[in-house]
């Protein structure tokens, strides 16, 4: 994304922005990272919960430790075993983050924690953000506002990734589309290397499910159109726009309904992304 297309925030630091009720603020530096494709939906949800709990000016302080009730992590994990797996995944994942000036840093997503300490305070988890990551976030001025209820409703990590990516762009003035090379778009969605290699499979198992959930549950609409070089799809054009009042009401109503049966309810309410002839 070019500098001219970045959301303008009047140089307000991201960590000084106060989230509204029912939302979290996520620095743009943590939305489109490279190297996170192996993180599951549960891993990504956990990271968002830990980030939301630590969010604020203190997040930029090196070696600052945070404490959260394990019960607050139940929205992402039903068992301690799976929680341990996700904690370890975040600790061992090294991602590449791009700074506003185009330079990059390679950092871990999660630092020290006491989850395995038998003497830790019962029911609580202490953790830290790696100092290199904390330093990088200190001067962040670009962010997305994410609705917590929407984040909790997604059943696909591809939907979560697409929602976050568009949420950081939807506040842009006079910008409603952006082009991505296909490899960059795969990275944005979190598609693992070697999986969904043809565009037909990528469309069927990642793009369409993501569009279905994002368009049904969020307060904006998203389109993804393929772009070809010759007969081969080599990129995509993403488009977005805010929903009208009726569209927002419909999304809110769906969020209040049981998750069971949701796919059947929303299938057919979102236009097909591609004509059949462009599928490989």
Tell what function each PLM region has:
Residues 2-280:
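Charged, alpha-helix-forming regions
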């Amino acid at each position: 994304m070019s500098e001219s297309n970045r959301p303008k925030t009047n140089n307000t630091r991201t960590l000084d922005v106060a989230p509204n009720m029912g939302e979290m603020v996520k620095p743009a530096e943590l939305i489109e990272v490279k190297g996170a494709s192996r993180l599951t939906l549960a891993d990504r949800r956990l990271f968002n919960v830990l980030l939301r709990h630590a969010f604020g000016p203190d997040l930029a302080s090196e070696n600052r430790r945070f404490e959260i009730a394990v019960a607050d992590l139940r929205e992402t994990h039903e068992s301690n075993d799976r929680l341990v797996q996700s904690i370890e995944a975040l600790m061992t994942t090294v991602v590449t983050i791009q700074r506003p000036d185009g330079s990059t840093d390679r950092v871990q997503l999660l630092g020290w924690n006491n989850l395995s300490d038998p003497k830790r305070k019962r029911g609580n988890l202490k953790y830290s953000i790696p100092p290199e990551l904390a330093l990088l976030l200190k001067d962040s001025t670009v962010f997305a506002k994410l609705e917590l209820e929407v984040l909790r409703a997604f059943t696909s990590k591809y939907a979560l990734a697409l929602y976050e990516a568009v949420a950081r762009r939807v506040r842009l003035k006079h910008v409603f589309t952006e082009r991505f090379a296909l490899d960059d778009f795969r990275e944005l969605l979190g598609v693992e290397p070697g999986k969904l290699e043809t565009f037909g499979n990528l469309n069927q198992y990642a793009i369409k499910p993501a569009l279905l959930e994002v368009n049904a549950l969020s307060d904006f609409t998203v389109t993804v159109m393929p772009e070809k070089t010759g007969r081969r799809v080599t990129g995509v054009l993403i488009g977005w726009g805010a929903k009208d009042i009726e569209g927002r009401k419909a999304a809110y109503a769906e969020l209040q309904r049981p998750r069971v049966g949701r796919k059947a309810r929303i299938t057919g309410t979102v236009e097909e992304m591609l004509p059949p002839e462009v599928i490989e």
